[in-house]
Regions:
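Conserved catalytic core of two-metal-ion nucleotidyltransferases
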Residues: 2-27, 70-130, 149-246, 252-288
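Active-site nucleotide-donor binding segment shared across nucleotidyl transfer reactions
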Residues: 21-54, 58-64, 217, 244-245
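A short secondary-structure junction signal
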Residues: 131-137
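Short, His- and charge-rich active-site/binding loops that engage polyanionic ligands
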Residues: 140-141
């Protein structure tokens, strides 16, 4: 991906972020920068120069409220709330807000008839199970959820998990069966309330992230950091979180690793994705 394209993506995502922040402030929803966006805020006061996406965390209660409030009160002509359900498969276990006036088709979902606008990715933070057995069960259900919800061979959980996933998909090929499995798994893994748990955890994402436990106070409140000239919330315990995930997060990675991570099959930031239905995505579908 070219530097100019990356810069344009960042400009679009900043606009989306500011709208999202305005919406969350209005409806008293908590969120924080995470991933590259968090490192960018702390190390660069904005985007990492080569980063082509923006990820957010929300406590599970706020994450679920967002799903209810967005369709009612947001500008849905402009931005769509997206999340895998019985009828739409995004091949991503989290949620997203997508810009309807853009096109950004990820290779892993190019066959799906879904919203293919540029995305602001959102992942929940959940209450962590307190005991060893309950925690092991929570992780088991989290991996089951990820497997059947995302419905693609994982590239961030190791080769053994990837091989096992391929076998399981062959056995459970029915979309209806997969849906009921991940819905049940989701209920089991999220039964520990975020607000009353002593620790919290990421149940969506990499296997490394799933295994980590964070003090609840690190995520209970926010501090604001400069991000491209705007004050954006990050979790109060961002330093401990970043050290745990990345170690020396202020150290720049080797030059060869400073590349955009998304594998886009096609991108056009000036044209609504629906214009490309049947051409660059859902090619077995006729245009309306």
């Amino acid at each position: 991906m070219s530097t100019s394209m990356t810069k344009e993506i960042q400009e679009k995502e900043l606009t989306m972020l500011l709208y999202f922040k305005e919406f969350c402030d209005k409806h008293n929803l908590r969120f924080y920068l995470c991933g590259g966006g968090l490192i960018g805020a702390i190390r660069h006061n904005g985007f990492i120069p080569w980063d082509d996406d923006l990820d957010l965390f929300m406590p599970r209660p706020d994450y679920e409220k967002l799903a209810e409030l967005w369709p009612k009160y947001a500008d849905t002509e402009r931005y769509t709330y997206c999340r895998t359900d019985r009828h739409h498969i995004y091949h991503d276990a989290g949620a997203s807000i997508r810009d309807n006036n853009t096109t950004f088709i990820n290779r892993h979902s190019m066959h799906e008839d879904i919203c293919h606008g540029l995305a602001l990715e959102i992942m929940p933070i959940d209450g962590c199970a307190p005991g060893k057995i309950s925690r092991a069960l929570q992780l088991m259900w989290a991996m089951t959820f990820a497997l059947f919800n995302a419905q693609r061979l994982p590239d961030n959980k190791g080769p053994m998990y990837r091989a096992l996933a391929g076998c399981i998909y062959k056995v459970f090929s029915s979309q209806s069966v997969r849906y009921h499995i991940w819905r049940f798994a989701e209920k089991q893994m999220t039964k520990y309330d975020f607000n009353t748990s002593k620790e919290c955890t990421e149940l969506i994402g990499s296997l490394k992230g799933m295994k980590l436990r964070h003090p609840q106070e690190d995520f209970a409140s926010v501090v604001y950091k400069d991000f491209e000239g705007h004050q954006i919330p990050v979790m109060k315990g961002y330093e401990r979180y970043l050290r745990l995930i990345w170690g020396d997060y202020m150290q720049l990675p080797p030059v060869e690793q400073r590349v955009a991570k998304h594998d886009a099959a096609f991108a056009d930031l000036h044209t609504p994705y629906k214009k490309y239905r049947g051409i660059y995505y859902a090619q077995n579908k006729a245009q309306p």
